[in-house]
Amino acid sequence: MVANPGGGSTDAGGGPVRHIPVLLDEVLAALAPAPGKFILDGTFGAGGYSSAILAAGAEVIALDRDPTAIAAGQAMVAAHGGRLRLVHSQFSHLADHAPQGGLDGVVLDIGVSSMQIDEAERGFSFQKNGPLDMRMSAEGVSAADVVNRAKVADLIRIFHFLGEESQAPRIAHAIEKRRAEKPFETTRDLAGLIELVTPRKMKDKIHPATRVFQALRIFVNDELGELAQALFAAETALKPGGRLVVVTFHSLEDRIVKKFFSDRAGKASGSRHLPVAHERAATFEAVGKPMVSASEAEAEINPRARSAKLRAGLRTYAAAEAADMSLFGFPNLASLGKLGG
């Protein structure tokens, strides 16, 4: 994923950027790839993590929901003599692609890739004019569908929760007024309206469209739901001693990962306001520090690493728990299938 969408060369809303694997040394240390191990890279992208894992002698099953990434990676498949298998799939389905004996490791790098941002026709960037799309694959509802069809109340919830946008009501009402005259079709069209209606004092640090574009991208691709389901899937697919390593770039994503590992540590609630609960068997144990961030040296070389956070867990022998989405407390956002209904 690309951090800080909206400013300079590292934006999820801007660009261009050159893809450099973030926290690569730290990922490899937590993942511990070695000959004979099967590692699943849930976010193949440009193949940065997969390449390093292969260099350590492990076998790699790499997933990506973007068919262009899978097509671009075929030369890499040919170069590694059968040790790399590429699969067009969302990482929430990673358990479907695990070998029968289970996985030795899973690594997830959450969010949009620099390759997607660099292609104006994908509609991720407000600094590159293109169709208002933002889909990581060709399926499902586009950002234009959301902007042109969602109820104002739904737009406010989407912008506020997924983008942490304080001006969500102002922007949503401006969108409603403008789309009644002419629907939004391009990224620059939407970004221009947001810039027009956002108070000048809000424009100091980042482009005013940054948070709205982030929210739309996360919503269109169900990124938080995908992440949550991938964590549950990894719990099922990892063998005892297997490692789950997750790199996030946004506080919403990091909270989900932190909550998952905390819950799977099996400890009972310590709140004096709740009934005493028995401790559950931990399905994950900590690997290294609870959270690892990029060094100043890496951040200087690769600015997208500044907001990156790595969390990792070691799979125990305890049985996987049931996948319960209520663990994360997601709000009730608009249904993709009922926009404008």
Swiss-Prot record:
It is an enzyme of class 2 (transferase). The keyword Methyltransferase applies. InterPro entries: RsmH, SAM-dep_MeTrfase_MraW_recog, SAM-dependent_MTases_sf. S-adenosyl-L-methionine binds at residues 47-49, 64, 91, 109, 116. PANTHER family: 12S RRNA N4-METHYLCYTIDINE METHYLTRANSFERASE, S-ADENOSYL-METHYLTRANSFERASE MRAW. It comes from Rhizobium johnstonii (strain DSM 114642 / LMG 32736 / 3841). One of its GO terms (molecular function) is rRNA (cytosine-N4-)-methyltransferase activity. Gene3D superfamilies: Putative methyltransferase TM0872, insert domain, Vaccinia Virus protein VP39. The lineage of its organism: Bacteria, Pseudomonadati, Pseudomonadota, Alphaproteobacteria, Hyphomicrobiales. Its EC number is 2.1.1.199. One of its GO terms (cellular component) is cytoplasm. Signal peptide: none annotated. It comes from the Bacteria. This is Ribosomal RNA small subunit methyltransferase H. It holds the Pfam family Methyltransf_5. GO terms for biological process: rRNA base methylation. It is found in: Cytoplasm. Belongs to the methyltransferase superfamily. RsmH family. The keyword Ligase does not apply. Its main location: cytoplasm. Keywords: Cytoplasm, Methyltransferase, rRNA processing, S-adenosyl-L-methionine, Transferase. HAMAP family: 16SrRNA_methyltr_H (MF_01007). It catalyses: cytidine(1402) in 16S rRNA + S-adenosyl-L-methionine = N(4)-methylcytidine(1402) in 16S rRNA + S-adenosyl-L-homocysteine + H(+). Specifically methylates the N4 position of cytidine in position 1402 (C1402) of 16S rRNA.
